[in-house]
Regions:
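Bacterial N-terminal signal peptides
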Residues: 6-17
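Conserved SGNH/GDSL esterase-like catalytic core that processes O-acyl groups on lipids
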Residues: 53-56, 62-135, 145
């Protein structure tokens, strides 16, 4: 049996040899908002013509576990295309309705201008989840466009014990994107394809829901490629996340994930 190499995610001085544990911020109920302080707001003079894209992520633990926006930013730097400047408003278990009611996301949108605002909630494979996703996509979209941005939808995935829900999740996010003429970022579809093609590439973390480093790498490939419109075939398997942070995916796994990500639209 061939021994498998493990992905390594280093966030600052914290080494995670594998995915976030079940005691992550999501399970502890700790809200996360990356680059969402005054210094970030004061640094919003980036010029799109100078090769910058400003992206706001609104979501929950599917976004903040492994810090997806940070990985997307790292990919933009490694790729040599427009540099992404990302902010994140994300709280455990939040739907778009929760974000709308709390108000932080709406205020962050108003702090624009943005190029893209990426919306995400849970898999939304049920009728109720789909209704919430579509309804609040309709509510957020005018605010997003007023801020000079295009709405985008980060399609996520169901729990590992609910793989039958992939189709419902994909349909929900496609409908939301279609209704507001937004961009679809089909990470969930890429996950489904990857699991079918090579289930030995572990996308799920130990809780069977949140992503491993490989899962976050795949999701980030889809998000970065979808927003930048640049090819991702040569994206490095090792990324510098700034400071001491880094993400390292085994070369063989990274090759599989790049090919899968390039095949979804």
């Amino acid at each position: 049996m061939r021994a498998r190499l493990s992905a390594v995610l280093v966030a600052g001085s914290l080494l995670l040899a594998g995915p976030v544990s079940s005691q992550s911020a999501a399970e502890k109920g700790v809200p996360r908002s990356a680059r969402d302080d005054k210094s970030a707001r004061d640094d919003q003079s980036a010029d799109k013509s100078a090769g910058h894209l400003r992206v706001l992520f609104i979501g929950n633990s599917f976004t903040y576990v492994n810090d997806l926006p940070r990985i997307v930013t790292a990919m933009s730097r490694a790729d040599g295309g427009p540099t992404f400047e990302c902010r994140m408003v994300a709280f455990p278990g939040y739907s778009l309705e929760d974000h709308w009611r709390k108000g932080d996301a709406r205020r962050a949108i108003s702090d624009g201008p943005w190029d893209f605002v990426v919306l995400q909630q849970g898999p939304s494979s049920t009728d109720e989840g789909r209704e919430i996703l579509v309804e609040y996509a309709r509510r957020f979209a005018p605010l997003i466009r007023k801020a000079g941005a295009t709405p985008a939808f980060y399609m996520v995935w169901p729990a590992s014990v609910r793989t039958q829900d992939f189709t419902g999740a994909e349909e929900s996010y496609r409908q939301a994107a279609r209704v507001v003429q937004g961009i679809l970022l089909p990470a969930g579809e890429a996950w489904e394809r990857s699991l079918r093609r090579d289930p030995s590439v572990a996308l799920y973390g130990p809780d069977g829901l949140h992503p491993s480093p490989e899962g976050s790498y795949l999701a980030a490939l889809v998000v970065y490629g979808g927003l930048s419109k640049r090819p991702i075939a040569s994206m490095p398997a090792a990324l510098s996340l700034g400071g001491e942070g880094k993400l390292e995916i085994p070369d063989r796994d990274a090759a599989v994930l790049r090919e899968v990500a390039a095949g979804v639209k």
